[in-house]
Amino acid sequence: MSAASLRLVDTPMDKQKALDAALGQIERAFGKGSIMKLGAREAMAETEAISTGSLGLDIALGIGGLPRGRIVEIYGPESSGKTTLALHAIAEAQKAGGTCAFVDAEHALDPAYARKLGVDVDELLISQPDAGEQALEIADTLVRSGAIDVLVVDSVAALVPRAELEGEMGDSHVGLHARLMSQALRKLTGSISKSRCLVIFINQIRLKIGVMFGNPETTTGGNALKFYASIRLDIRRIGAIKDRDNVVGNQTRVKVVKNKMAPPFRVVEFDIMYGEGVSKVGELLDLGIQAGVVEKSGAWFSYDGQRIGQGRENAKTFLRNNAAVAEAIEAKVRANAGLVASAMMGAPESDGDAASPD
């Protein structure tokens, strides 16, 4: 073929015809919508978010909450608030008319506590599977139905492979749990994206043996979930909240360790009160100070020139009893979300795990 004919084929019109033919062939083979321009559909261009129940965490995540159609991992030590955070997300989704499911592999969900957090337990679907394979098959079926808005798996550590359940105590099953998670996530990822379902995996922490330098902590289930998760949240209890001698809640810190939707490494702190969940009025005080909306002078908190309480607990009580003031502070905090988010930036953590999901 001559050089002239090659140049003739290389015109923009010929390229467009070749591209149209290729796109038509792909759509005939795999169905309409199997390939498109990124901005062709509004649903593809913008990611919907489901609130976490924490105003500060919604701001830290950059998109107003947890993204639909993505995988989220929440991990931390025992009794740090992992399940509480997941139940708050379920409650927020239900308020918006969504349908939610909870795969309780730990067999430890308390309906009374879930109800106190605002979860409609009469409408919440719950499964308590016997084996890890069963739990993940149930999750896959629910996601593929396209009818579920939020699915929580509690927890990855409790997804015991059937071979381990049927074996003897002390039998070695090296890598079985990691292979189960890797296979399940490969299967789930596509259907999660198509169904616009938010899938939250709750995970536990383990210590790596023989680590002399760096962070010795790791999560269960291998490396696959670290790769497939769009957002990873590290939640820790950093202190106790006391009423005289009684502990009535925990001070909690959440770090956005990974975020594919916005800048990561933001850190937010809030109170988790026993029987109540995330303290919204406590958050309003903290975020209000960061946004310059609430003033703190000594032990006194003031808003708009008016003193609202001496001491944090008294100020929280004032906001709890004066909903109009609380709403006004929240509106101003949301208006100054960029300023608040910039104050949340933390340092990245080094993670020595760099293996492929297989």
Curated annotation (Swiss-Prot):
<dbReference type="InterPro" id="IPR023400">
    <property type="entry name" value="RecA_C_sf"/>
</dbReference>
<dbReference type="GO" id="GO:0006281">
    <property type="term" value="P:DNA repair"/>
</dbReference>
<keyword id="KW-0963">Cytoplasm</keyword>
<dbReference type="GO" id="GO:0005524">
    <property type="term" value="F:ATP binding"/>
</dbReference>
<dbReference type="InterPro" id="IPR027417">
    <property type="entry name" value="P-loop_NTPase"/>
</dbReference>
<keyword id="KW-0233">DNA recombination</keyword>
<dbReference type="InterPro" id="IPR003593">
    <property type="entry name" value="AAA+_ATPase"/>
</dbReference>
<keyword id="KW-0227">DNA damage</keyword>
<dbReference type="InterPro" id="IPR049428">
    <property type="entry name" value="RecA-like_N"/>
</dbReference>
<dbReference type="InterPro" id="IPR020587">
    <property type="entry name" value="RecA_monomer-monomer_interface"/>
</dbReference>
<dbReference type="InterPro" id="IPR020588">
    <property type="entry name" value="RecA_ATP-bd"/>
</dbReference>
<dbReference type="InterPro" id="IPR049261">
    <property type="entry name" value="RecA-like_C"/>
</dbReference>
<keyword id="KW-0742">SOS response</keyword>
<dbReference type="GO" id="GO:0003684">
    <property type="term" value="F:damaged DNA binding"/>
</dbReference>
<dbReference type="InterPro" id="IPR020584">
    <property type="entry name" value="DNA_recomb/repair_RecA_CS"/>
</dbReference>
<comment type="function">
    <text>Can catalyze the hydrolysis of ATP in the presence of single-stranded DNA, the ATP-dependent uptake of single-stranded DNA by duplex DNA, and the ATP-dependent hybridization of homologous single-stranded DNAs. It interacts with LexA causing its activation and leading to its autocatalytic cleavage.</text>
</comment>
<dbReference type="GO" id="GO:0016887">
    <property type="term" value="F:ATP hydrolysis activity"/>
</dbReference>
<keyword id="KW-0547">Nucleotide-binding</keyword>
<keyword id="KW-0234">DNA repair</keyword>
<dbReference type="Pfam" id="PF21096">
    <property type="entry name" value="RecA_C"/>
</dbReference>
<dbReference type="GO" id="GO:0140664">
    <property type="term" value="F:ATP-dependent DNA damage sensor activity"/>
</dbReference>
<dbReference type="GO" id="GO:0006310">
    <property type="term" value="P:DNA recombination"/>
</dbReference>
<keyword id="KW-0067">ATP-binding</keyword>
<dbReference type="GO" id="GO:0005829">
    <property type="term" value="C:cytosol"/>
</dbReference>
<dbReference type="GO" id="GO:0003697">
    <property type="term" value="F:single-stranded DNA binding"/>
</dbReference>
<dbReference type="GO" id="GO:0009432">
    <property type="term" value="P:SOS response"/>
</dbReference>
<comment type="similarity">
    <text>Belongs to the RecA family.</text>
</comment>
<dbReference type="InterPro" id="IPR013765">
    <property type="entry name" value="DNA_recomb/repair_RecA"/>
</dbReference>
<keyword id="KW-0238">DNA-binding</keyword>
<dbReference type="Pfam" id="PF00154">
    <property type="entry name" value="RecA"/>
</dbReference>
<feature type="binding site">
    <location>
        <begin position="76"/>
        <end position="83"/>
    </location>
    <ligand>
        <name>ATP</name>
    </ligand>
</feature>
<protein>
    <recommendedName>
        <fullName>Protein RecA</fullName>
    </recommendedName>
</protein>
